[in-house]
Amino acid sequence: MSSTLQAILDDTRRDLAARKSAARTKEFEKRAAEHTPRGFRTALWERAQAGVAVIAELKKASPSKGLIRANFDVIALAKELEEAGAAALSVLTDVPHFQGSLENLERASQTVRIPCLRKDFILDPAQIVEARAYGADAILLIVAALTDLDLRNLRDEAKRYGLDVLCEVHDRDELKRAADLGFDLIGVNNRNLKTFRVDIENSLRFAEEFPPNALRVAESGIHSREDIDRLRDAAYSAFLIGESLMRADSPSATLRELIG
């Protein structure tokens, strides 16, 4: 595990310890029961049958790039990207490293009809009910950050709340772990966790090793329709795109160009 990822996970655990409580979880349970999740995996699969399924990511900043978008109006961006054809949204909720928030997730979820992914470092079941309470329809589980037992337990907890799980891998060994655990929505992150270098060839190197039932998602480093076409030729069904959209003067115009 890279030192950067370890530092982020340590911060996440400290934050969880500071705000986790039985009363807070009970309140989230109540709020979670008020909403019916929108099918995240189904939305991606259906859009992929008709065109290009893009998960548009609302990301203000990152540890490697610093501030990405200064004019970060979550409601306006969510509306704009849905209207431009996004199949789903990914909303960063990590505060210290990505300048995200659960409130941003809630605002986006209440604004759009497409499903929303909570993009964060999920380590504890308490974060899952919290995600549902704030309107998430899916969560991200990062194989590099979790043991196989953690992955199973957190996936089961997500299912309890009707949430889909995007299982994120970075290399061949992590893909095998995800496949052996039976995940059916697997994303390959093209960002090297040690160097932070991004290379979409990472998604192509082991494309043939996916389990047959898994819907494939390519994440990071996608900047053009040519990138998408190459990945589609390798049987990728969906594409998580953040920085290209967030740096654009017109995210909607950029998304339309990518979708074609």
Swiss-Prot record:
One of its GO terms (biological process) is L-tryptophan biosynthetic process. Keywords: Amino-acid biosynthesis, Aromatic amino acid biosynthesis, Decarboxylase, Lyase, Tryptophan biosynthesis. PROSITE patterns: IGPS (PS00614). It catalyses: 1-(2-carboxyphenylamino)-1-deoxy-D-ribulose 5-phosphate + H(+) = (1S,2R)-1-C-(indol-3-yl)glycerol 3-phosphate + CO2 + H2O. Signal peptide: none annotated. It holds the Pfam family IGPS. The keyword Hydrolase does not apply. Its EC number is 4.1.1.48. The keyword Lyase applies. Belongs to the TrpC family. This is Indole-3-glycerol phosphate synthase. It comes from Koribacter versatilis (strain Ellin345).
